[in-house]
Structures are given as C-alpha cells and as structure tokens.
C-alpha cells in the first residue's frame, strides 16, 4: 500500500466545487473516476481543502491510498491521459502512510483577482471579479497589512461555517498586479468558510472608499459579520499553494 500525494491545477468553472456530491460533476469525483480507470480501485481522494463551485486551483494538494503497481512518477502523465482538459495533475510523490493532505497542512495561500477597468472583460469573465469603478490601491495595500497576525476572524466567516474555532493566523497579506488584474494574496494557517472572499470584499470596500484601512482592526474586534465587506463571487478566487 502506498500513499500518493498529487499536486493539481484546475479550472473550477464547470464543476460543483471540490467535494464529491451525488449526481453532480465535482473535481474530487472526476479525479477519483480517473484513478479507478487506471488502477481499478475505488479510492478516497483527500484534498487539502474543499474549494467551492467556480473556485480555481493552481496547486491543490490531495492524497489517496493505492495498491497499484504504477510508478509514482508516472501518475501525472497517466491520469492526465484520462482526465478532462480543465484538470491537470502537475506532480505526484509518495507520502508517509499517515500523511493527510487536509490535516497535515500547515499553511495555505489564496489569491483573489479583481479586473479594474471600465470595459467588461470577455476572456476573464470566469477568472476575475469585474469592478469598473476607481479604486485607491494604496489604501487597499494598507488594509492588507491589518489582517496579518493571529485574530478571531468571526467577522470574516459565513454564518453556516462548521469550524470549531474562528481563530486563525494570517502570515501574509498583500496586493500586487498580474494579468491586468489587482491580485490580493493571503497566506494563513487555515481559512474559515468564505474567509478569503470576505477579506477580499472588505479590501475592495477600502479601495472604493466605503471603509478606511484603520477600520479593519475594529471590524476584526467586533466579531460581527455585518461589519465586513460582501462575499465576492467564487470565480475570482484561486488556491495558490499548500505548505506541509
């Protein structure tokens, strides 16, 4: 028996999120079917996190147990030969049998892309949030810095979260530019349900002048979801990296 850790890139547009659901096309379900085609085994693919419908991943991590004789380094090519084009296995390594892509993770990085131009993008419509109004990028950068540290992020968590605690440590948060978009990067030891999208929505409100950067500590302290910005749509969000 081996424990195989995959690094996966996917376009979440056509899927109902990561987690397997009855009669719905999901990332987990699609990859498990591909593994079954190769090995004949029914496996349980454990992802580092359950990305929502429409969310993308550059380096999602997931592990599964197998008795297959396929060499570990051959799994990417073999799986990609049977997977659809919007899912790609980038790497495969053998992990210890007690390793879990979910529970062994120490930190994750997400980014959120905002397309801030007057004209609506056609090619980026499923890959960035369109915001045509003027933004104060310097204020947004200052707002990012207030998120760094260990806090109770209850204000930045959807009400239907099942988390045992809302305390998380944010290691880094910053703003940059890429692919004609504003990119908000957040690295933390874990993310609450919709936390990255709510933080991005709050930073956007700062850029729009609805909030000030120094409002962020007050919003965190309030532990009140209504004080933070809206939850931005899923299609601007990307799982960038997972560290073990």
Swiss-Prot record:
Keywords: Isomerase, tRNA processing
GO molecular function: RNA binding; tRNA pseudouridine(38-40) synthase activity
InterPro entries associated with the record: PsdUridine_synth_cat_dom_sf, PsdUridine_synth_TruA, PsdUridine_synth_TruA_a/b_dom, PsdUridine_synth_TruA_C, TruA/RsuA/RluB/E/F_N
Residues annotated as the enzyme's active site: 52 (nucleophile)
Membrane-spanning residues: none
Listed CDD domains: PseudoU_synth_EcTruA
Enzyme class: isomerase
Function, as annotated: Formation of pseudouridine at positions 38, 39 and 40 in the anticodon stem and loop of transfer RNAs.
The protein's name: tRNA pseudouridine synthase A
């Amino acid at each position: 028996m081996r424990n195989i850790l995959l690094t996966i890139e996917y376009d979440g547009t056509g899927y109902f999120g990561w987690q397997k659901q009855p009669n719905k096309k999901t990332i987990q379900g699609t990859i498990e079917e591909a593994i079954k085609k190769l090995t004949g085994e029914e496996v349980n693919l454990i992802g580092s996190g359950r990305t929502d419908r429409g969310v993308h991943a550059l380096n999602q991590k997931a592990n599964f147990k197998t008795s297959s004789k396929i060499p570990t380094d051959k799994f990417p090519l073999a799986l990609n030969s049977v997977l659809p084009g919007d899912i790609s296995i980038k790497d495969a390594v053998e992990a210890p049998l007690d390793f879990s892509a979910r529970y062994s993770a120490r930190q994750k990085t997400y980014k959120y892309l905002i397309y801030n131009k007057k004209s609506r993008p056609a090619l980026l419509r499923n890959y960035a949030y369109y915001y045509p109004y003027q933004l104060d990028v310097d204020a947004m950068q200052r707002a990012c810095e207030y998120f760094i540290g260990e806090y109770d992020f209850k204000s930045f968590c959807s009400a239907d979260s099942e988390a045992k605690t809302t305390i998380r440590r944010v290691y880094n948060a910053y703003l940059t530019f890429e692919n004609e978009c504003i990119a908000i990067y957040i690295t933390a030891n874990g993310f609450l349900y919709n936390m990255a999208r709510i933080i991005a929505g709050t930073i956007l409100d700062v850029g729009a002048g609805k909030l000030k950067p120094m409002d962020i500590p007050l919003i965190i302290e309030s532990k009140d979801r209504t004080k933070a910005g809206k939850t931005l749509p899923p299609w601007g969000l990307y799982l960038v990296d997972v560290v073990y």
